[in-house]
Regions:
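A short, N-terminal "cap"/entry segment at the start of jelly-roll beta-barrel domains
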Residues: 1-39, 120-175, 179-180, 283-291
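Conserved short histidine dyad/triad with adjacent acidic residue
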Residues: 22-33, 42-59, 177-197, 243
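Short, low-complexity cationic-aromatic patches
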Residues: 35-38, 52-63, 79-80, 95-103, ...
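A structural feature that tracks compact, well-ordered secondary-structure segments
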Residues: 45-47, 73, 110-111, 178-182, ...
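A short beta-strand-loop-beta hairpin characteristic of the jelly-roll/cupin
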Residues: 49-87, 202-233
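Conserved metal-binding segment of the jelly-roll/cupin
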Residues: 82-103, 110-113, 228-251, 258-262
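Double-stranded beta-helix
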Residues: 102-162, 173, 206-237, 248-291
Length: 291
């Protein structure tokens, strides 16, 4: 029998080490698949660069780098790209990238090499151009959404990062999906589920933020007998496919999170099957395809 995607979290301590390096967030042993892999289709990594140069390489169709710390530049796909904390970079096939920083930097790096390894194929065609999503623009858009009296009440207060090459899926690449999300202080973002695996990265938070994950809902539309993942800035955790999950902020400050999924592929295959719970409170709870 094929094993399920496990619950697993990854400590942010790697981002404090004194030397450059790459840490694959590998659960391939639990998945019983050729490694390394964080989900059947994706591999997430922590990357640390200390005053110098580091090369990354992946036999993948899509790579996403989120700049968690620092500033510098990257040479990839025949281009030199300047980056700073909070920026997002995506690169297509031809997986080598050379990163430079004069100080200290950290990336959250996700790519789809495990999917290609399973299929026994290599990426031969660039499906999109190297793209940078600047933090300042994403943050301004997120603030606009959070300030609007209508959109601020949405199930998720977030900016969906999308590439114009993929107008049907509206995703950051043809396989990857990424969202720059806000979890406002004192708020609960109610349960929803989807058939893509989420590799969540906590950008910033204070103690008191967490995600509840589980397979069932109670009569009030909240997660029944859930597994709790406490947030910590720079940490990552896995949300298994098909599991309900809700986000909670019991701290006194806003928090930010970056879920990355294989939902670009699922959306194209029409297998995402996203559902939202609408808890009861003063009325009967229900589930729908609308947030």
């Amino acid at each position: 029998m094929i094993p399920p995607v496990p619950y697993h979290s990854f400590s942010p301590d790697f981002f404090q080490q004194k030397t450059s390096g790459i840490l694959p967030l590998d659960v391939s042993r639990q998945l019983k698949c050729p490694g390394p892999a964080t989900s059947p289709a994706l591999l997430a990594n922590f990357v640390r660069i200390v005053k110098g140069t580091l090369k990354t390489n992946a036999l993948a169709t899509s790579q996403l780098f989120f700049v968690f710390q620092g500033a510098g530049r990257t040479e990839a796909c025949g281009r030199t790209i300047e980056w700073k904390e909070g920026d997002f970079m995506v690169f297509p096939a031809h997986g080598e990238a050379i990163h430079h920083t004069e100080g200290e930097a950290g990336f959250y790096w996700v790519h789809d090499a495990p999917l290609l390894r399973y299929l026994g194929v290599t990426a031969t065609e660039e499906r999109f151009h190297p793209t940078v999503f600047e933090h300042s623009k994403a943050a301004a858009k997120l603030q606009q959404i959070a300030s609007d009296p209508v959109t601020s009440q949405a199930n998720r207060v977030s900016v969906l990062l999308a590439n114009s090459n993929f107008p049907q899926t509206r995703t950051i690449t043809h396989t990857l999906w990424a969202m720059f999300g806000l979890l406002p202080k004192g708020k609960v973002q109610y349960p929803h589920r989807h058939e893509s695996v989420a590799l969540d990265f906590v950008i910033s938070c204070k103690p008191g933020c967490y995600t509840m994950i589980g397979t069932e809902l109670d009569s009030d539309g909240m997660i029944k007998n859930g597994h709790r993942e406490n947030w910590k800035s720079g940490a990552s955790f896995i949300t298994p496919a098909g599991y309900w999950h809700s986000h909670h902020n019991e701290s006194g400050e806003d928090a930010h999170v970056l879920p990355i999924q294989d939902a670009g592929l699922h959306t194209y295959l029409r297998t995402l099957d996203i559902l939202y719970s609408h808890p009861g409170h003063d009325k009967t709870s229900y589930i729908s395809q609308r947030p």
